[in-house]
Amino acid sequence: MGIKTALPAAELGLYSLVLSGALAYAGRGLLEASQDGAHRKAFRESVRPGWEYIGRKMDVADFEWVMWFTSFRNVIIFALSGHVLFAKLCTMVAPKLRSWMYAVYGALAVMGTMGPWYLLLLLGHCVGLYVASLLGQPWLCLGLGLASLASFKMDPLISWQSGFVTGTFDLQEVLFHGGSSFTVLRCTSFALESCAHPDRHYSLADLLKYNFYLPFFFFGPIMTFDRFHAQVSQVEPVRREGELWHIRAQAGLSVVAIMAVDIFFHFFYILTIPSDLKFANRLPDSALAGLAYSNLVYDWVKAAVLFGVVNTVACLDHLDPPQPPKCITALYVFAETHFDRGINDWLCKYVYNHIGGEHSAVIPELAATVATFAITTLWLGPCDIVYLWSFLNCFGLNFELWMQKLAEWGPLARIEASLSVQMSRRVRALFGAMNFWAIIMYNLVSLNSLKFTELVARRLLLTGFPQTTLSILFVTYCGVQLVKERERTLALEEEQKQDKEKPE
């Protein structure tokens, strides 16, 4: 079935009406549950005073989000504003030294935040992978990179290396793991690109400029070295038409998203409710499904805000960073499921595509996904819940290929060929709806807890069968059809754009 297959406008209107009504109904259930549970003893630690003048408390269960926009807000603004200011001055006065300014400012910021010994620790890892790159053996560079990453994820080395951080503060562990892990991935990218292009003679200075670019340092996203080096080496970068307007719009959207999350957390305690399973079990089925869905949406919003702020600064520096992740609402295939495009690009370039090739053969695809999720497990930090998450998502990615091969099998292919293109789209959307909930359940394991995931699965699939199960499946089907319609519109717009660009 082609992506350009259209459905009747009345049918799409019905889907929109059903989806809007279902979301409103689930939202009302969550709002009532949040109001009822605001004063529960189990909520005292994570539901704190908020808008007292209207009697609303605030969900503060996400430690990182609260720290970013309270105690560390001014530090973040000061550090990024200083970076933008010095970058602008350097671009005006000495554009050839622009990349050096990025590295020096970033290194000083890291040293001021984490201490000089931590900076020396990272320099040691950088030098180690630089030396490995001189040998020109990709397998050695990747192996050493993974060993370095493991040293930041497993005891006793992680405990020893964390001792290099000076002082103690709230976000110390988050910054330590973020800065260290991203440093290893960047250094590994540098080493692999050096092996792939020995004629370019990359230097240690190039690696340091790449690694200590402050906006990307602690939280990413990660750009592969070849892309970063090509963009940052432009002596006189030129902005595209309308680029500044796009940067301002991106910054504005980030501010709006931050305000929206703040407002949302005063009315919906979506992060706190799952911690009290007895209370969560009393929710209506629709509200429970909405709670599971909203947990993934929030994680996407959190990533989009983080990368939106960082990418705004990077765009001011004339870089083209990885875009924020695709909204979870638009994901109904495992192949597009990722919450960090930078890490996804890194894994695809150096592992997944290298092993899987065209991703059309079952055995190479299985090997590629196993290798990719093995590295992802190491990146996230090996533990039981991460093992389970990796297994489920690895299975989901391969299961999609198996189903695709099955659909291409003679009898099934002939059955689909006998259907109209509209009916084929409807059948595929039905499978997409089931896949959508598989994505939610598989990722809810790591974003929340295994017990909460078991509760959702039991209520929606067992005790709620068939009424709840089929109702939620139909609502999801409506959503998938609307996503497909959006994809169809974008494909047509892209085709028209390409036609206009063709010489007459």
Curated annotation (Swiss-Prot):
Organism, as annotated: Homo sapiens
Tissue expression notes: Heart-specific.
Biological process (GO), any one: negative regulation of N-terminal protein palmitoylation
Lineage of source species: Eukaryota, Metazoa, Chordata, Craniata, Vertebrata
Annotated compartments: Endoplasmic reticulum membrane
Transmembrane spans: 12-31, 65-87, 100-122, 127-149, 251-273, 288-310, 429-446, 461-483
One protein family per Pfam: MBOAT
Keywords per UniProt: Endoplasmic reticulum, Membrane, Transmembrane, Transmembrane helix
Assigned GO CC terms: endoplasmic reticulum; endoplasmic reticulum membrane; perinuclear region of cytoplasm
Function, as annotated: Negatively regulates N-terminal palmitoylation of SHH by HHAT/SKN.
Protein name per the record: Protein-cysteine N-palmitoyltransferase HHAT-like protein
InterPro entries referenced in this protein's UniProt entry, alphabetically: MB_O-acyltransferase, MBOAT_fam
Gene: HHATL
Family named by the database record: Belongs to the membrane-bound acyltransferase family. HHAT subfamily.
UniProt subunit comment: Interacts with SHH.
Membrane topology label: Multi-pass membrane protein
Domain of life: Eukaryota
